């Protein structure tokens, strides 16, 4: 497993815990854009959506709950 994949999984877990990509980014010392990009890369790698996203909320999909 590549380091970037580990970062993407850690980012996913932190976003799921906090319910926010912005807060997950702050907790990891990265930008919100980097957090979002890691999530997109992980979803692309897995071939599933892990979160339902709106401008104000983030919630796990069924696939996201299973992956967690």
Predicted features and spans:
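Short helix-boundary/capping micro-motifs
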Residues: 13-29
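Short helix-coil-helix linker/hinge
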Residues: 2-7
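Short alpha-helical "packing" element that flanks the helix-turn-helix/winged-helix DNA-binding module
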Residues: 8-15, 67
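A short LG(V/I)-centered, amphipathic sequence patch enriched
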Residues: 43-60
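Alpha-helical residues within the helix-turn-helix
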Residues: 26-27, 44, 65
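Short, cationic-aromatic polyanion-contact patches
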Residues: 62-68
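Residues within the DNA-recognition helix of helix-turn-helix
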Residues: 31-34, 38-41
């Amino acid at each position: 497993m590549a380091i970037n994949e580990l970062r993407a999984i850690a980012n996913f877990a932190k976003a799921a815990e906090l319910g926010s990509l912005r807060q997950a980014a702050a907790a990891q010392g990265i930008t919100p854009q980097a957090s979002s990009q890691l999530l997109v890369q992980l979803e692309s790698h897995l071939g599933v959506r892990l979160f339902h996203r709106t401008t104000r909320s983030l919630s796990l999909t069924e696939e996201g709950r299973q992956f967690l």
